[in-house]
UniProtKB/Swiss-Prot annotation:
It comes from Homo sapiens. GO terms for cellular component: bicellular tight junction; plasma membrane; tight junction. It holds the Pfam family PMP22_Claudin. One of its GO terms (molecular function) is structural molecule activity. InterPro entries: Claudin, PMP22/EMP/MP20/Claudin. The gene is CLDN25. Residues 32-81, 146-164 are extracellular. The lineage of its organism: Eukaryota, Metazoa, Chordata, Craniata, Vertebrata. It comes from the Eukaryota. This is Claudin-25. It is a multi-pass membrane protein. Plays a major role in tight junction-specific obliteration of the intercellular space, through calcium-independent cell-adhesion activity. One of its GO terms (biological process) is bicellular tight junction assembly.
Amino acid sequence: MAWSFRAKVQLGGLLLSLLGWVCSCVTTILPQWKTLNLELNEMETWIMGIWEVCVDREEVATVCKAFESFLSLPQELQVARILMVASHGLGLLGLLLCSFGSECFQFHRIRWVFKRRLGLLGRTLEASASATTLLPVSWVAHATIQDFWDDSIPDIIPRWEFGGALYLGWAAGIFLALGGLLLIFSACLGKEDVPFPLMAGPTVPLSCAPVEESDGSFHLMLRPRNLVI
């Protein structure tokens, strides 16, 4: 089956959204949101995520400890937990709805109007998933920058810096945003083919019946069988 340009754009949007959703899940799990290198002990690196804090020592296994209380976390990490989990739910639900509402997948028992509404709702959820991914990652980055350049902290105290998970989170948000934009753009390419409604009654078979002309000659004419006398 040859796919239309509209279907290819929808497929590209779905793949980008799926990639962004996977990257967002990995970002949530990784502890490398912030890193801290100790000048007194260069062989030891501290890493902090939204779920745990770890100490990475060379030639020694990494030791991690989960945060004991949600309320004891900084405000940016509390918000990051909530929004990242919400992003996973919105992204997954948006992917499913966009798949059901796209031309890439055909379901005979789904009505066209209902399918179009599913696609519209899915595109909205994908855009929301992008926002709920970029916001917590950017907030944690902003808080890290503020603490790094805080003049009230003595220079001898080590400062937290960006971890690799922040860059992955930004990439996830961009992929989700691009996927959502492609899905929205596909809706503006043109109208979908609306299926014609089925006839209310059964189809009447045709038959030939003679018709008399004014000059006395006859010719055959197609008529419904139930109208032939």
